[in-house]
């Protein structure tokens, strides 16, 4: 409430004080005017907003292509990543012996925060499991290497995902090739002709052979 001030001229003046807010703590209470009050006290509802800047779609595609090139090069030249994909390579074994790992696709989020790397692994089940597990274990290492190779304000988080589409496609192609080969071999086989039977029929004596017909 405003305070009432009396003067000698019998005029009244109202002294207005800004509303005072009190915040209690474990030790003492703090008093401050409304302009200095926390946001959650000045408004009934405190709203937390997260602002994300979306990059240009063209730039997103360019970043995805560059990441795909860098990762493909790392699979060929980086020994740390090669040994993670195929541990036998560290012992001197052929790194193409049990599995072959390739980067099939790369997707970058619109805010350039996350990159999904789709990996195709050709080989037996054990080789696939080892390769995918090795790549996932080196996700932070790959992110740091990408930060060194690429000029980005923020290096995106790397997530490796197994891509089974190419393997399924190769299986379908193999099945179609097998069917085509079987069909071609079936058409190449000639059916036994009846020419030999016809020859045998001609060799049989004709009962009317010795009969002379007179007109």
UniProtKB/Swiss-Prot annotation:
Residue span of the annotated presequence: 1-52
Keywords, sorted A to Z: Chloroplast, Plastid, rRNA processing, Transit peptide
Comp. bias (Basic and acidic residues): 183-192
GO CC, alphabetical: chloroplast
Primary subcellular site in the record, as a coarse category: plastid
Keyword match Membrane: no
Signal peptide: none
Region (Disordered): 183-210
Example GO biological process: ribosome biogenesis
Cell compartments where the protein resides: Plastid, Chloroplast
Acidic residues: bias regions: 194-210
UniProt keyword rRNA processing, yes or no: yes
PROSITE patterns: RBFA
Family recorded in the similarity comment: Belongs to the RbfA family.
Protein name listed in UniProt: Probable ribosome-binding factor A, chloroplastic
The species this protein was found in: Arabidopsis thaliana (Mouse-ear cress)
């Amino acid at each position: 409430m405003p305070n009432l001030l009396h003067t000698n001229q019998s005029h009244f003046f109202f002294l207005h004080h800004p509303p005072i807010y009190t915040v209690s703590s474990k030790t003492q209470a703090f008093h401050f005017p409304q302009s200095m009050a926390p946001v959650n006290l000045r408004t009934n509802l405190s709203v937390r907003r997260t602002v994300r800047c979306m990059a240009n779609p063209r730039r997103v595609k360019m970043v995805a292509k560059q990441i795909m090139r860098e990762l493909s090069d790392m699979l060929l030249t980086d020994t740390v990543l090669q040994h993670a994909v195929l541990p036998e390579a560290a012992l001197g074994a052929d790194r193409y012996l049990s599995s072959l790992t390739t980067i099939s696709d790369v997707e970058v989020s619109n805010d350039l925060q996350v990159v999904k790397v789709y990996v195709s692994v050709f080989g037996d089940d054990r080789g696939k499991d080892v390769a995918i597990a090795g790549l996932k274990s080196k996700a932070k290492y790959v992110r740091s290497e990408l930060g060194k190779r690429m000029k980005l304000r923020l290096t995106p988080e790397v997530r490796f995902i197994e891509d089974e589409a190419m393997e399924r496609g190769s299986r379908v192609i193999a099945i179609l090739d097998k069917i085509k080969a079987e069909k071609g071999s079936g058409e190449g086989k000639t059916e036994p002709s009846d020419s030999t039977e016809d020859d045998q029929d001609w060799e049989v004596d004709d009962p009317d052979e010795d009969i002379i017909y007179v007109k």
